């Protein structure tokens, strides 16, 4: 039987997909054309670019307008839950009505000092918008798995619900299984390229391929040993190609088959936003 990669037209080359990053970040903006070019040379063909604050929204939308490979997501990160400006929800609604955007990056983070009650209120408000406008949702979760999983199970488990992705997953195998049962996508970051990430590698092995996405979270999540060598100051989307090869090895599958599967996953995940383009 032919593999899924072999079934594709020989003239069609499937690209790597970076399922979560921040191209609007100042660390990348200074040399963004070179960053995109290097990614393209490695075969990376799509970028899910996420805002973290209201200041990012128009920047992310502008990037998507000038770089066809960029899929925009706009939202407010939990780190900024205590500094949101009045009227943010109405302004986000207006952009969602006008633009082909997903919602994110939002979520919960007990590691940061921002009041958790405010985080929950902000997260739930953005969940409501993703549901209202039927847009894909990108979730950041650190040490907050109980409330995050409860909300996803309550709001996103139905067939009519928009898709949701847990970015840079750091939870347990058991939590992953609950999320997958609820229909969520699990995105693994370039942290997996680090030597000491045994826990996350175990989760990756147990996660069904049809629910996996891969990301760099550029310019963050540079593997610690790379940073220690001083060879690189920040992460870049081109390194997602290395992550694909690592994941293919861990899952014991052909990397070309993995590219096909994850490209399909990305298309399904972003369909709600892309359908408005």
What residues fall within each predicted segment?
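Mid-domain alpha/beta scaffold segments of enzyme catalytic cores
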Residues: 1-277
